[in-house]
Amino acid sequence: MFEPTAIYAPNPHRYDTMTYNRAGTSGLKLPAVSLGFWHNFGDITPFDQMKSLVFTAFDNGITHFDLANNYGPEPGQAEKNCGLLLAKYFRHHRDELVISTKAGYEMWAGPYGLSLIHISEP
């Protein structure tokens, strides 16, 4: 599926300068800055540019990536590209990341474009 690549080695000091705040009473800590995938992770952005954005964010302690099912452009493409980036470069760092998404955008016409099945399928 993917061509062999060098293993991504993030900045070992990535947590030293970022401020982290507790999310309510959950105990979850989130960085003061998150990376939103709205416009820069769709079909029109070169994959190397997406990779550079994510590497720079993570190297600076940004551990929260924000997505939605309509982010692109083309709707849904940002989630797909995030999945590719996670699988290819962040497999060994997945436990350090918080990935959030939202649902509410109808992905296609018909009764299943915003169904529970669509929202919950991997």
Where is each model-derived feature located?
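N-terminal binding-site loop/beta-alpha segment at the start of enzyme catalytic domains
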Residues: 1-98, 107
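Active-site-proximal loop and beta-strand segments within enzyme catalytic domains
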Residues: 108-114
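Residue-level detector of conserved catalytic or cofactor/ligand-binding positions
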Residues: 115-122
